[in-house]
């Protein structure tokens, strides 16, 4: 399948979806998009800018949710035009899907909503590439049913994304077998490296996170031969308005991506061992 002007899957080099969790301001979006676009261009990595206009599943009613659909789409359109990069954003059950589809290159469905049949169908009917996040409660082999729903709309541009599985209260773990298992769906497989280290509700009224584990999990996912890496980043994670504890420090990302590119090339150049 294609995102904008590049191919994903089928052994192609990994692509990156990255940006701040939520659109905090137009200036923040432009600054982060510009920096990430420059870094990925220098490294030769295909890039999709990610940021959300609304975070509908925040832990607390008092948590910052975003700038709303109208302002958010206006900013994403400006990012896309200014830096000539594709963009991805989250959609929710009450999102005006057609309006979003006019702007973004990829629509992303939240993990909590992966079993909501009407929601999945309505999103996929827009005809855009869709990144479906696997629920924290779902076995990887059960994603075949979610994919079947999605593709029943005639949309074959479906990706599946691993973002960790619930492990007791306020904790997630990443089962790397999940990435290999989900390849059986026939869809490109994406690993969400930053939400996988989230501690849901771990700070009482907000989620915590262990960003120190993002590098090791990302490298492990590369060893499986993933098609895409999802990694939220922020210039000052401690000051982020959403998901700061698990966001990757933006100004450290170039060196890390360079390493991941080497790993990706090494793994995908090796023959698969059949057992």
From Swiss-Prot:
GO terms for molecular function: 3-deoxy-8-phosphooctulonate synthase activity. Keywords: Cytoplasm, Lipopolysaccharide biosynthesis, Transferase. Its main location: cytoplasm. The keyword Transferase applies. InterPro entries: Aldolase_TIM (IPR013785), DAHP1/KDSA (IPR006218), KDO8P_synthase (IPR006269). It catalyses: D-arabinose 5-phosphate + phosphoenolpyruvate + H2O = 3-deoxy-alpha-D-manno-2-octulosonate-8-phosphate + phosphate. It is an enzyme of class 2 (transferase). Its EC number is 2.5.1.55. Signal peptide: none annotated. Pathway: Carbohydrate biosynthesis; 3-deoxy-D-manno-octulosonate biosynthesis; 3-deoxy-D-manno-octulosonate from D-ribulose 5-phosphate: step 2/3; Bacterial outer membrane biogenesis; lipopolysaccharide biosynthesis. GO terms for biological process: keto-3-deoxy-D-manno-octulosonic acid biosynthetic process. The keyword Cytoplasm applies. It comes from the Bacteria. Gene3D superfamilies: Aldolase class I. Pfam families: DAHP_synth_1. GO terms for cellular component: cytoplasm. It is found in: Cytoplasm. NCBIfam families: KDO8P_synth (TIGR01362), PRK05198.1 (NF003543). Belongs to the KdsA family. This is 2-dehydro-3-deoxyphosphooctonate aldolase. It comes from Francisella philomiragia subsp. philomiragia (strain ATCC 25017 / CCUG 19701 / FSC 153 / O#319-036). The lineage of its organism: Bacteria, Pseudomonadati, Pseudomonadota, Gammaproteobacteria, Thiotrichales. The gene is kdsA.
